[in-house]
Amino acid sequence: MWRRRFATSAATTTVATVSRFKPVIGLEIHVQLNTRTKLFSRCPTSDASPNRRVAPFDMATPGTLPALNHQCVHRALKMSRLLKCHVPKWSRFDRKHYFYADMPAGYQITQNEYPIARDGLFGYWVFGEETDTPYWKEVEIVQLQLEQDSGKTINILDSSPSESSESRSLIDYNRAGCALIEIVTSPCFETAIEAIRFVQTLRLLIIHHNLSDGELHRGHLRVDANVSLTVDGKPGTRTEIKNMNSIRTIHTAINFEIARQFEILSNSSGKVIRETRGVDSEGRTVPMREKDAEDTDYRFMVEPNLPILKIRKEWMEGAERELETQGIADFEWLRDRCGFDPRSSIHIAEEPDLLAFVKRCVRFKDSGVTADEILYWMRELKTIMQRSKGNYPPKSDFFAKQFTTLIHHSGRLTRLRLLDLLRFYATSSESEEDVLLEDVMEFIDKNDFWRINDTEKIDKFVEESMAKNGKLAEKVRSGHAKSFNKMRNLMIETSEKRIELEDAEDAIRRFLQR
Amino acid sequence: MNRFFKIVLTSTRRASTNGSGKRKTPFEGDKVHIPDEPYNSKVRFFICFKKKLKHGIQIDESLLSEMPPIDAKLISHLERLSLVRFDSEQAVANLRNSIRMAKRLELVDVEDVEPMHTVWESQECPTFDDVEEEPLPIDKVFRNAAVRFDDFFVTPPGNVPLESNERFDLNVINKWDTIGKPVAPEAKTIRLAEGRRK
């Protein structure tokens, strides 16, 4: 029910946007760094049961002082280089005050006025549904700041109406004080697709350079989006969608919010309220319980316990050196070196199994095989594996080699024969019999599976088949379409799939015209 | 004036002599900056900010910006910021007085002076290697916890909306210092309750 309603409102948005409204979206991305210890304490960050990863500083024990983790600075510098940011000679930490039980000091140490890096630029490909042509987009990065994470809260709500309500919160400080990098972009996205492709690309880059584990579902990447609609070019009121931790959620929530604001604004008296919104399980944005109609006053002040952080030249050089040795990320390699289109390179790089398969294929790739051919036959292979209930993609090196060899020779084999061979090799190598299998070239040669191109030979097959199946031949002659196809299939079958479908059809037509 | 120097001199002299009951400093011979006896801070004001003050040691209140009226909105804003609840008109009136006192700082000439944020201004922030240390054992983590549930701290739910702020007699708060009473009248709610009882 909701889906239908949502779909219609989204559709109207796109129509009306052209005339009056334009969405403006800005993102704040919190990246949890995968350092061994926290940002300001040497408490380990490994997984553990609740409150087992807490140092005195993390629970704001009076008298404890912050001790900055060098690795966090190092990773922030790497990130600044990746996002082509300007890194000032020094930066400073600030306190941002608010009361939450999972923030035991009553403030978060962050970087507000003098962040570690600012004014960056990040380019990436945007692609939508299958039919869209990808386009290049550059995003302005406003700033990049190091900050502490909060602990985790479990809310236990007691719905009983009695006054002695049992509502309470359970707090786990394991995450409190872990290192985050917050990336703030300018409001330069116009669609939800642009926003999610940015997050996807950034995520792959972050994982490649070992800045974060980048697992969205585990909260390593949390995204806030500021959404507003400009009306006839005039900026509108924005709402902030908090804490989205899956690509799909980001997409649906932003679209939902655009549709919601559009519905409000298209009513002449409607007004969007500036507020913070959460996301429910369906991707709808809902007002958060907290009331912050008036601007929250965070009472920013300079962190008095941390002197100015001067960025040394050798730190910067170290970060650059490491980025260089790490080389380009897999999706960039696929896109720029192997010729995959932007959509497939992101798609493949996001799936470790697919990536491993493609890497194997590229290793065995004969010079003649293009990325598009690999993609085409991978799709066919996927269907084959789904039908035969095998695992896709097959994991063995042997199969990858046969796969690329087959693609390389695809011009010399009929499509049906090639599919047959793929099925045979994929299912057999899956069952670990590949040691017994011979190389596909030998196999084809031995059985003479090569495609028949000689028209005379093909004509002979037609004559034979027509002669053998008298009744069917009659029907074909009378122009019965189904029989025509049946005859064609028969021919292909008797030729052991060595005649291409089109060739067979042409030959029958030729025969009939004679 | 004379009194101030006397205090400073006596305190320095006392610190340098060694004996029981005397002020001690970590290193012998260090100056003691905190005087033993309190002195009128207005004297200090006069010394530091002579230029700004018109009539000697008296602070000219007319130079200060006007006190903002304390209204229900401001009270609730302050309560939200501090997470502290005012319990009576007296509490708010005291705060108002403190604000008025603090306003004197407006007279300090800070033009072209960078605010000081830390005593480590000339230092660089030290960084530490990313090497794990043993976290606190679980019993120490919970040593100060009033309520514990399994291995979690327990707190009241957050984001509780504040109650109505029309609790105080704003007139009393804003006029208290001109009434001249040392203690502000009791809160409206209590008075009302008592009135009903009577």
UniProtKB/Swiss-Prot annotation, chain B:
Allows the formation of correctly charged Gln-tRNA(Gln) through the transamidation of misacylated Glu-tRNA(Gln) in the mitochondria. The reaction takes place in the presence of glutamine and ATP through an activated gamma-phospho-Glu-tRNA(Gln). Belongs to the GatC family. It catalyses: L-glutamyl-tRNA(Gln) + L-glutamine + ATP + H2O = L-glutaminyl-tRNA(Gln) + L-glutamate + ADP + phosphate + H(+). One of its GO terms (biological process) is regulation of translational fidelity. Keywords: ATP-binding, Ligase, Mitochondrion, Nucleotide-binding, Protein biosynthesis. This protein may be expected to contain an N-terminal transit peptide but none has been predicted. Its EC number is 6.3.5.-. It is an enzyme of class 6 (ligase). It is found in: Mitochondrion. It comes from Caenorhabditis remanei. This is Glutamyl-tRNA(Gln) amidotransferase subunit C, mitochondrial. GO terms for cellular component: glutamyl-tRNA(Gln) amidotransferase complex; mitochondrion. Subunit of the heterotrimeric GatCAB amidotransferase (AdT) complex, composed of A, B and C subunits. Signal peptide: none annotated. GO terms for molecular function: ATP binding; glutaminyl-tRNA synthase (glutamine-hydrolyzing) activity. HAMAP family: GatC. Its main location: mitochondrion. It holds the Pfam family GatC.
